[in-house]
Amino acid sequence: MPRSLKKGPFIDLHLLKKVEKAVESGDKKPIKTWSRRSMIIPTMIGLTIAVHNGRQHVPVFVTEEMIGHKLGEFAPTRTYRGHAADKKAKKK
């Protein structure tokens, strides 16, 4: 179920402070965060946010189409390496 409109979007305060500071100074350095649950807001457009995927920080460049989505949607946590090949078929 989606979040109530009267509450507004959720964003961690520590991340919001970093975003506002980067916008003020015009800094283009990636903002490192572990907050995958934070929603992308319009002030983040044009910034690069390094989102943690459990192993490393994945750089995510925020565009206009991403507004309203969560940061974690753009940093996949699982890697799919394919199913094991059939060993009998390889020998022939």
From Swiss-Prot:
<keyword id="KW-0687">Ribonucleoprotein</keyword>
<dbReference type="GO" id="GO:0000028">
    <property type="term" value="P:ribosomal small subunit assembly"/>
</dbReference>
<comment type="similarity">
    <text>Belongs to the universal ribosomal protein uS19 family.</text>
</comment>
<keyword id="KW-0689">Ribosomal protein</keyword>
<dbReference type="GO" id="GO:0005737">
    <property type="term" value="C:cytoplasm"/>
</dbReference>
<keyword id="KW-0699">rRNA-binding</keyword>
<dbReference type="GO" id="GO:0019843">
    <property type="term" value="F:rRNA binding"/>
</dbReference>
<dbReference type="InterPro" id="IPR020934">
    <property type="entry name" value="Ribosomal_uS19_CS"/>
</dbReference>
<protein>
    <recommendedName>
        <fullName>Small ribosomal subunit protein uS19</fullName>
    </recommendedName>
</protein>
<dbReference type="InterPro" id="IPR005732">
    <property type="entry name" value="Ribosomal_uS19_bac-type"/>
</dbReference>
<dbReference type="GO" id="GO:0003735">
    <property type="term" value="F:structural constituent of ribosome"/>
</dbReference>
<comment type="function">
    <text>Protein S19 forms a complex with S13 that binds strongly to the 16S ribosomal RNA.</text>
</comment>
<dbReference type="GO" id="GO:0006412">
    <property type="term" value="P:translation"/>
</dbReference>
<keyword id="KW-0694">RNA-binding</keyword>
<dbReference type="GO" id="GO:0015935">
    <property type="term" value="C:small ribosomal subunit"/>
</dbReference>
<dbReference type="InterPro" id="IPR023575">
    <property type="entry name" value="Ribosomal_uS19_SF"/>
</dbReference>
<dbReference type="InterPro" id="IPR002222">
    <property type="entry name" value="Ribosomal_uS19"/>
</dbReference>
<dbReference type="Pfam" id="PF00203">
    <property type="entry name" value="Ribosomal_S19"/>
</dbReference>
